[in-house]
């Protein structure tokens, strides 16, 4: 998993509430267990019409937001089924941070496990960032995980909270496998000791 330290990029505004995981990545794209390639179908039913043509008015189809790395979203983002493909699709598209007033619990947890930083802010703070994001190509926002601050286009800063353990994992690029590998010496020592104590096992 890639480390998350400081992210500076275009913020795309998506003020819709209750964006569920089926909207993020529709069910017909869940057949794969690969994490790559899902970005092409991120928000598929909002990005494309029935003939597969881009819908020009959708935010991520607009030239200013095609390379967005930050998503400023509405309340209860990521609700619905618990598909891990949802954060996979966001990450594959290039989104490393989602900012909203609230997230569905499972989606929120899955983001951290896949290298995405979900940030919960007050409504007025999200509204301010949403206004900033409306600037298009000028909507450059910086997220500093170490200092837990967001810096807007005008230089104003907003502080955010994040669990200390999850922060540690993101800063060091540690997913569940990485965390286990950190304990490899202790695991090997335990196995060696257990083999001596119970050689019949």
From Swiss-Prot:
Recorded catalytic reaction(s): these are: (2R,3S)-3-isopropylmalate = (2S)-2-isopropylmalate
What UniProt keywords apply to this chain's record, in alphabetical order? Answer: Amino-acid biosynthesis, Branched-chain amino acid biosynthesis, Leucine biosynthesis, Lyase
Q: What is its EC number?
A: 4.2.1.33
Q: Which domain of life is it from?
A: Bacteria
Q: Which Gene3D superfamilies match?
A: Aconitase, domain 4
Q: Which GO terms describe its molecular function?
A: 3-isopropylmalate dehydratase activity
Name the Pfam families for this protein. Answer: Aconitase_C
Query: What sort of enzyme, by top EC class, is this?
Result: lyase
Function statement: Catalyzes the isomerization between 2-isopropylmalate and 3-isopropylmalate, via the formation of 2-isopropylmaleate.
Q: How does it assemble?
A: Heterodimer of LeuC and LeuD.
Q: Which family does it belong to?
A: Belongs to the LeuD family. LeuD type 1 subfamily.
Task: Give the protein name, as stated in the record.
Answer: 3-isopropylmalate dehydratase small subunit
Please give the organism.
Jannaschia sp. (strain CCS1)
